[in-house]
């Protein structure tokens, strides 16, 4: 089981989101957090997306996800893990201009710590107070509309 958390921030307003799945991996939860955050934006935005997941941030910023798509979601050694979620992420990103920012986890980044707490809380609901690796994503939109 795992949990994910995301916080949308705009002009002093914040919207917290969280969820989880009974059967999952930390990488699927990291991707899910980003997808849910981007999908929650009401219109195309300029987004600064902050995450402690090198898996997610590097896969996009280094262009790997686009290469995987071009190769039919295959890479050396077989199928791309989580191809279903990578496809959802590309769809969720499409209307937006996204700047990707990696932050180190668990070093006091305010939104990262809060996202971690959201993910842990949801996970504990699923697991009756057990611990877990969790997901952390902060998305910031820069349009003049409510999140």
Predicted regions, residues:
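RNase H catalytic domain
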Residues: 1, 34-114, 118, 123
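RNase H-like nuclease fold core
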Residues: 1-45, 117, 121-135, 139, ...
